[in-house]
């Protein structure tokens, strides 16, 4: 009887240990999926907020707009990036794959930089040694594709926004 009790206790202990370990891979998968969802949502936001950048990376959904840069637009972007940072804070890099962890760290740094640029009001600088708000306009003809009538219409729509 004692032997049976010991065996049952060991089995229960092993079962408990196994049950304790099982949620970790599920959590890792959940964190990986959450991370992908976060960066995909942020990427869509980034393309909408920076249509010239979208065109540059080959996304032509916003070829007819320049983007908005008012104080309220800056504040809205800041709120989105603060929210993204909070969501990222709920994900542990240790629960991600090695490659996702690297991507996570790079992405988190980009988000931190967007937040810092707003908080230091860097958007008020019209130009610096790296570029500037108005400099993008001068490159519009070079960076616009002119393959069909719609491309010309998109270009004219952007010029109209100036």
Regions found by a protein language model. Give the residues of each.
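Non-catalytic accessory/assembly modules
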Residues: 29-162
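Sec/Tat signal peptide C-region and signal peptidase I cleavage site
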Residues: 24-28
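Bacterial N-terminal signal peptides
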Residues: 11-23
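Bacterial N-terminal signal peptides that target proteins for export
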Residues: 2-14
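Generic N-terminal simple sequence motifs
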Residues: 6, 19-21, 47
């Amino acid at each position: 009887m004692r032997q049976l009790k010991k065996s049952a206790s060991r089995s229960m202990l092993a079962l408990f240990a196994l049950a304790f370990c099982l949620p970790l891979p599920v959590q890792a998968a959940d964190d990986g999926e959450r991370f992908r969802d976060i960066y995909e949502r942020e990427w869509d936001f980034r393309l909408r907020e920076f249509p010239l950048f979208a065109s540059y990376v080959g996304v032509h959904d916003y070829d007819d707009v320049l983007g908005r840069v008012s104080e309220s637009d800056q504040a809205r972007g800041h709120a989105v990036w603060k929210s993204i940072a909070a969501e990222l804070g709920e994900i542990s890099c240790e629960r991600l794959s090695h490659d996702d962890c690297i991507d996570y760290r790079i992405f988190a740094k980009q988000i931190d930089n967007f937040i810092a640029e707003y908080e230091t009001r860097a958007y008020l600088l019209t130009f610096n040694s790296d570029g500037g708000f108005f400099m993008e306009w001068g490159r519009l003809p070079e960076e616009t594709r002119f393959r069909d009538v719609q491309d010309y219409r998109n270009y004219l729509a952007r010029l109209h926004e100036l």
